[in-house]
A protein has these predicted regions:
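Bacterial signal peptide processing site
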Residues: 39-41
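Secretory-pathway extracellular proteins and peptide precursors enriched for disulfide-bonded cysteines
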Residues: 28-31, 97-115, 178, 204, ...
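C-terminal motif of bacterial Sec signal peptides marking the signal peptidase cleavage site
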Residues: 35-37
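Extracellularly exposed regions in secreted/surface proteins, prominently low-complexity, repeat-rich
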Residues: 141-144, 151-220
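Short, non-transmembrane alpha-helical segments in secretory-pathway proteins
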Residues: 47-70, 179-192
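N-terminal export and membrane-targeting signals
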Residues: 9-28
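Short, charged N-terminal extramembrane segments
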Residues: 2-8
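Short, solvent-exposed recognition patches
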Residues: 70-144
Length: 220
């Protein structure tokens, strides 16, 4: 006996073409999630092109609202971060930046040993979760140094800030480049060991010295 009010009408089965369309839609949505958004088309998506010092410099110039006096490839941090690290050095008058991406390591420069720096803290800067490390001024010896670091799966991206006298925590100092801009730079997904072809091509337009600057090994 059929219970009162029970609607025995069966739901129509989905035909094969409909199932095919649904499968395509699901596949596209999954691809969009993996690529961090559809319709990017602006060269920001990660790729498999090895990043170059010139490409790193091009990315840095998008975040730093200053005109560099000099740009050079840099290997000054390679002894600490490894031969697979890639870096660019940009000089802006009283401040210079060394921007590096390297395979993950236990280097003290990425705060693997937090006692290496005077301070090594994880902080949110303008919505970007980064690690900030610094060594303070030693009068008549060393002006100090600041590092802003993004530790990711498989790699570390960081920027070393040289030039200003570090007399306090970086949040309380004028570094020459806003801390928020430095944080946005190191978390930029294009700043990776491998990046997209458009980013590499963008770097081809950068006037960069290949010999490297005369830097002193850091941080001391």
């Amino acid at each position: 006996m059929t219970p009162t009010g029970w609607d025995q009408t069966e739901e129509p089965a989905l035909d094969s073409p409909t199932l095919g369309v649904l499968a395509i839609v699901i596949a596209v949505l999954v691809a969009c999630v993996l690529l961090a958004g559809c319709g990017a088309g602006d060269g920001h998506a990660l790729g498999d092109e090895p990043i170059t010092p010139a490409a790193i410099a091009a990315i840095a110039q998008e975040h730093v609202d200053l005109e560099p006096r000099r740009i050079a490839a840099s290997t000054v941090l390679a002894p600490e971060l490894g031969d697979r690290s890639t870096a660019a050095w940009l000089e802006y008058g009283d401040v210079s930046l060394t921007v590096v991406v390297a395979p993950s390591s236990n280097s003290p420069l990425v705060c693997a040993d937090p006692t290496f720096f005077d301070e090594c803290v994880t902080d949110s800067v303008d919505g970007h979760e980064v690690t900030i490390a610094w060594q303070q001024l030693e009068p008549e010896e060393d002006p100090g140094v600041v590092y802003v670091i993004d530790r990711r799966k498989g790699e570390d991206a960081l920027v070393k800030v040289s030039g200003p006298s570090i007399t306090d925590g970086p949040r309380d100092l004028a570094l020459g480049v806003p801390l928020a801009d430095l944080a946005a730079l190191v978390v930029d997904p294009r700043l990776s060991l491998t990046t997209s072809l458009p980013v590499v091509e963008q770097g081809a337009d950068v006037d960069i010295e290949q010999g490297g600057p005369h830097e002193t090994p850091a941080p001391r």
